[in-house]
A protein has these predicted regions:
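Extracytoplasmic
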Residues: 9-73
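Short glycine-/aliphatic-rich beta-strand segments at the starts of folded cytosolic domains
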Residues: 1-5
């Protein structure tokens, strides 16, 4: 499980957010191609259990990123 804080078309934007979120754990940028377009996903984790991810999700949302969500690869 991961907490996805956002997905961006600009790599610099994703890395900027990732650096800010390191206070909540292992934040990183993962590249993804969707419909022929490259996106840079900012994710925290991995977490072994969804409950662990939910705790971090609450912290990220309290930080102001309301559209963050728990995802599973």
């Amino acid at each position: 499980y991961f907490v996805q804080a956002g997905a961006f078309s600009k790599q610099d934007t994703a890395h900027s957010l990732s650096r800010k979120l390191t206070q909540f754990g292992n934040a990183r940028v993962a590249e993804a191609d969707v419909d022929g377009k490259r996106f840079y996903r900012v994710r925290l984790g991995p977490f072994s259990f969804p409950e662990e991810a939910e705790v971090t999700l609450a912290k990220v949302r309290n930080y102001g990123i309301q559209n963050a969500s728990v995802v599973r690869d």
